[in-house]
Amino acid sequence: MSHVSSHREVIRPSHHVDGTLRSTPDTVLWGYIATNLPPALTIKSGQIVELETLSHQGLTTNEDPENFFAAYGIPSNEVLADGKAVFAEVKRPKGASVHILTGPIYIDDAMPGDVLEVRVLDIKFRVPYGVNNTGPGKGVLPKLLSEPAAKLIRIDLERQIALFSDDIHIPLNPFMGIMAVSPPTSLGMVSSTPPGAWGGNIDLKFTGIGSSLFLPVFNKGGQFFTGDGHAVQGDGEVDGGAIEISLKPTLQFIVHKGKTIKQPRVETASDYLTTGLSTDLNEATRIALQEAIDFLQREKGMSAADAYALSSLAVDLGIGEAVDIVNLVYAKIPKRLFKSNPEFWYPPNRS
């Protein structure tokens, strides 16, 4: 079976943007991912797109977003106009989740059986604040709280920190909680909450600036969606949310023809990451580990025994998210283990 080769051409990102996709009532889906919708944008492999995305915070209550954010001291002129428009004009289908997704982007030549690489070239903040929202029934400890607990957190862009409190400042690590291709047609419309082989709500903090996300393609054009911006999040997203925020990512889309993967994969300047997805955390762990061993055998030429041993000695398993019905476990393989690695498009230790 063919696979994603680590010996691939290095395509350097340029400052040129080939397309822009705004978040408007006509270019977003609310709470679901669907297949074969009309394209919001069509591009070629290798092209770069700047996207606007919207956080769902402030849009899922019965009051409008201006009133929601006014309660936290945010003036009307700091509430995004496209968020107000989506709240007023877009209706969530029955049974849909909360996330607002921009797309779909069709990539020419992407066909079922290919792999779509999504390079995260840049992420900008659209607003200087985000929200962490939890409460009864949410997160890993659903019985911990007896009342809803929404916390607005200011973002200091100059210092690149989130001002959790006077004493606690959290370094920013922005990433898109949801990046997805359209799922197999047999699934029909799927909720945006549980992730799957198509990506989706993987909430994996390693998919920030300078990362590549690899997704299997199930439908012609790939049909890419993104949303659920996070300013920062810990492994697990344990209370059910990150600092949820509206972001503007710049992404490059590269189709790898004739390649095959079963689960989403990630590559950074320092690590290879495989993933396992399951409603059962133990099964997700087994899948992530098996994916890592398969990677080491195919990409690094190792025997199964050596790959298993190396995984026990130097590969870290972690819980990417534990709150979205389907759990995600990752296996992180440090590149420093290998004397030589193919050149990566994003240099290490880049500021």
Regions found by a protein language model. Give the residues of each.
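Short, Lys/Arg- and Gly-enriched loop/turn segments at beta-strand edges
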Residues: 56-68, 123-133, 221-231, 320-323
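Conserved mixed alpha/beta catalytic, RNA-binding, or beta-rich assembly cores of soluble enzyme
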Residues: 172-282, 293
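A generic structural signal for residues embedded in beta-strands
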Residues: 51, 115-118, 215
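C-terminal alpha-helical interaction appendages
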Residues: 276-351
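Short, well-ordered loop/turn sites that connect or cap secondary structure elements
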Residues: 43, 107-110, 207
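N-terminal, Lys/Arg-enriched amphipathic/low-complexity engagement segments
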Residues: 11-12, 18-94
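Intrinsically disordered, low-complexity linker/loop segments enriched in Gly/Pro
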Residues: 78-79, 86-89, 94-106, 115-205
